Amino acid sequence: FFEYLSNRPNQRFGGGLSESTLRNYRMSLRRFTRYLESKELGCLDVGLSMRSSEVRVLPQVLSRSDIESLYEVMDDSALGQRDRVLLGIYYGCGLRKSEGWALELRDVLWDKSLLYVRKGKRGKSRYVPMVDRVRRDVLRYVQDGRRELLGKEFRSGLFISSQGGQLSSQSLYDRFKQLKKLAGIESSGGLHLLRHSIATHLLWGGMSLEYIRRFLGHSTLETTQ
């Protein structure tokens, strides 16, 4: 029973049920079991002996409407174009924070609609597909917004700051927090929240765990699960 609860989606906030919610379920069922025993009606066996540490809590995720709300607060300025690329890279392509920050122009394979992640976890590289929306946003940013931010400077990195330098990973995180606030999204979590969200949405859409594993760059299927 608790295996079911630990994997049940949170209908209101996305992700899984919180530890406190699971604990409340456990306490209520324990009290009900004691009532049955006091009335000599038997015992309810639902795995009440399971410890909190044994209950797997799913990561929090954004809903699809949350993602669209993020897009809606972005304008057509150079920084707005960069915002769309931020969302496309971390949600649309499911990259880790360090992977997205390390992307360079040479890592965008336009003819194949792929990103080359050369600095993945544990030094592993991989190719990640870009859907049409992400490819269009990246192309527009590279041809327009990025050039405006750069001025006469030369930088190899994809993400450029408003001063024309390489945008720091902390700045990417801070900007995502600002976008969430503008969109009225209260969910906590940084850029990894977008990675969890796309993985969950792919699963809900019928994508196999094996494909999602390769998409995310996980070494084992257990990590994806």
Q: Where are the language model's segments positioned?
A:
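Conserved catalytic core of the tyrosine transesterase superfamily
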Residues: 1-225
